[in-house]
C-alpha cells in the first residue's frame, strides 16, 4: 500500500505542547498539519496511514496523537468537534488499536474511550455522519461488543440513550438492524434477553434508567418509522427471534417470569411476538403454571390479560370432530386428540388452539397448507406486534390497519389501568413530614381539576356553538340547493318548451311538404295514366291498321296468282292494250309509293310494341318489294279499288 506523505511543516511539535493547546489551536494544528491527500488505504485499520509515525506529532501515529488528546480532554463536546474533522480524512481512526507504548498490546481506541467512561463522546460518534465515508461508522458497534466483563453490545451499554436510538431509527436503517441483532458476548442472547432481566438495569450517561422499558421504546420508534422502513428494508432487516435461547438455555419469557419482570413479559408478547402458548421450563408446563412455580405474582395478571385477549377457543363441535375421524394440525403436523383444542380455519383446515396463538404472535396470517389469509375473527385475537405493523401496507390495506390500531389501543388501555393499580398497591405510607407536601399536592391537584373542568365547560360551550353554526350553514346550504334545483328545473322546462316549438314547426313544414309532394305525385300519376291511355288507343289503331294491311296483302297475293294465270291464258295481242297497261303501271307505281310512305308513318307509331312483335310481323312494303313489277302494279290497282 502507498502511504500518504505529510506536508512539510516548521518542525516537530511536542505532543505535550499539542495537548496543552486549547481547542481552536489544536483543531488548527490537526487540520493544517494532517496529510493534504490520502490514498484508498484509509479504509484499512492496519495501513501505514494510521500506524506510520509523523514527525510533526513527535513521531507518533495519528491514532496515538488523537487518542492522547481525547482521553486527556475533560470537555467531550470540544473533543467531538475536533475529531469530527479528522474523521473526514481518517474514517477508521477509532477502529484502530491504541497503544500507550511499544510493549502495550493495545485495544481499539473506541474501547479505550469506553474504559475511560467517555460515554458522551462515544454517543456523539455513534450518530456521526461522515460526509466523505458515508457507509463507514465512526465506531464499529456492528462488529464488536464493548470491552467489559459481560461483553455487552452498544445497545446494552451506557453509550445508548432514547434520543440516540430514535435518531438512528430515522437516519440509518442499516445501523438500526445491525445494532438490534448484535448478541451479548459471554452469555449470548439478544437485547431481548438482556432487558428481560431486572438485574441488567443501569443508568446511562444522560441519567436515564435503562431497564425493560427500553423494549417498549424500541418497538415504538420502529413502528413510528415504518413508512421509511417500507421504502428500504436491508437484508439484515429482521427483529431478533424472541423464542431463541441464550447460552444458558433460557428464552426471554422465562427470564422475565423468573424475575417477575411483568413489563418485560408484556412487551415480549404484545410487541415482539413471543410464543406464549407453548410449554416452559423443565416441567413441561404452561406459562401460567411456570409463573406460579416461580412465584411471579405480578406476571400472573399479565398472563391473564394475554390469555383473555390473544387465546383461541374451540370452534368445532364434538359431532364434527368425530365425523372427521383423523384431524391433523397444519401447524405442528400432529393429530388433534381433543375437540377442545381444535380450531377450524376459514379455509377448512384445522389447528391446535395454542398453535394458532403462537402463529398469530409471529404475524403469520396464512394457512401453511393452502396459503389462504385468515379472517377478521382471527385478526382480532392477534397482539399488536412490530412484525404485524411492518407487514401492513398502509396505502391499500386500511381494514387490517384499523384492526392493528384497535389491538394497540386495547394494549395501551391495559397498561394504563395496570400501572394505576400497581401504583395504588405499592403506594407507601407517608411520614408526618410529608403531610405538608401531600396537602400542597392535593391543593394543586384540585386547582388543576378545577381548571380542567372550566376548560371542559368552555370546550362544551364552544362545541355547541360550532354545532349550531354548522346546523345553520347546513340549513342555508339546503335552502340554496333547493333554489338552485328550482332554477335548474325552470330552465329545463323553458328549454323543453323551446324544443317542442321547434319540433311542432318542423312537423307543420313536413306536413306541407308531404301535401305538395302528394299533389305533384298525383299529377304525375294522372299524366302517366293519360299517356298510357293514349298509347293504348294508338296501339289499338295500329293493331286495326295491321289487320287491314294483312287483308290487303292477302288480296295482293291472290291477285298475283290470278295475274299469273291471266298472262298465261290471255296475252294481249294489240299494241293499244300494251300501251294502256303501261300507263296503268305508272299510276300503280305512284300509288304504291304513297302506300309505302303511309306504312312508314304507321310503323313509327308502333315502335313501343316490343321487338318480338315487330320481328314477327311483315310489313306490306316488304312483301310488295319481293313481287315482280307487273304484279306490284296490279296490287296497287287492287288497293285503289
Swiss-Prot record:
It comes from the Viruses. Coiled coil: none annotated. It catalyses: S-ubiquitinyl-[E2 ubiquitin-conjugating enzyme]-L-cysteine + [acceptor protein]-L-lysine = [E2 ubiquitin-conjugating enzyme]-L-cysteine + N(6)-ubiquitinyl-[acceptor protein]-L-lysine. A zinc finger (RING-type) spans 329-371. Pathway: Protein modification; protein ubiquitination. Keywords: Host-virus interaction, Metal-binding, Modulation of host ubiquitin pathway by viral E3 ligase, Modulation of host ubiquitin pathway by virus, Transferase, Ubl conjugation pathway, Zinc, Zinc-finger. GO terms for molecular function: transferase activity; zinc ion binding. GO terms for biological process: protein ubiquitination; symbiont-mediated perturbation of host ubiquitin-like protein modification. Probable E3 ubiquitin-protein ligase which accepts ubiquitin from an E2 ubiquitin-conjugating enzyme in the form of a thioester and then directly transfers the ubiquitin to targeted substrates. This is RING finger containing E3 ubiquitin-protein ligase WSV403.
